[in-house]
Each structure stands twice: as C-alpha cells, then as structure tokens.
Amino acid sequence: TLPDGQTLPIDFAIDGAGRCDITMTWQGERAEVPEFGLLFPLRRELTEVSYQGLGPRETTADRTAGGKMGAWNYNVRQDFAQNSPVYPQDCGSRTGVYSATVTGSIPGICFAGNGMTFSALPYTPHELENARHLYELPRDDNKTIVRCAAFQRGVGGDNSWGAKPHADACFAVEKGTSFRFTIQK
C-alpha cells in the first residue's frame, strides 16, 4: 500500500522470447516503507523452488549471519510448515537472491534480480496477517504467492520485549529509488 497521494510507475518490457523486464521507480517524497517490491500469485502446481542466494533457511535484512551463499531448494508448503510460528505471520524470505525458479507439475517460471529479497508462500500477506491461529488460514491451498523485492524491513526482536528493527534493517525510499528484475520461462 502506498502513502496517500503517491503513485508508483511500473514499466514492463517484454522481448520476443517472452522475457519480461520489470522496473519500479519511486516518484514520491522520502518515505520509510516496510518493503519495496511486487507479489505474484502463481498456480498451486508451482511448489518447488530452486534459488541462488543466502540459505538454506530463511534470512531477513537483520538475520543474514546464518545464511550461506549457494544454490538451494525447498518445497513451498513444507517450508511454510517448518517455519510457521505458533501464530501465522509472514515468513520464508530469502535475501541476496540472484535467481529463483519456481517449478512443479507444470512448466515453471524464473525470477532474476540483483540480490533481491524473494519468498514463495502458500498464503498472501493479507491472509497471514488476518489469521490469529494456523487453523484460521484458508484451506483451499490453491496458490503459491511469490514476492520479489528490492528490500524488506527486518524483523527486529533483539529481546523478548518486541524490539523494533535496527536502523540498518529499515529502509527509506527516495525519489528515483528503483528496483529492476526479470521474469522468464
């Protein structure tokens, strides 16, 4: 969601081979935002992720020390089940991702960016935010939601009192801040 009165142009350039270059450029005033990226709903058959970036488990802007750069694989639904907390919340982000391919029983799709934040979950952020318990999540299991972002705010919580993320894990967009990535078969 954008701040009131703000717009965010998104340019798509598609070549003859079906490669789509996407560029988002912030036009507004300086603003602190929780993330700067796009979500893509994919068909439920696309559940296997292979990526090059920090892994093998989730990493965030303030939780990269345990990640190792490499080639990693995971199943979207199994990864959510292993990483989901007692109550639903956004999880499964991978940082420093240069390419991620989502495949399954149908032809897959590849997302490529320059060290982007990537996630693939069986639920939308809205569904996760509105469920207080795991059993309140939709049972239709009919989608995979991919996030490609230039950045996503860190999780914070250095202590048990719910500390906010440190300044280096929070991000502000300035006029002209852009994010470019590619989608292709």
Specify the residue positions occupied by each region the protein language model found.
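Beta-strand/loop-rich accessory regions of lumenal/periplasmic or secreted enzymes
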Residues: T1-K185
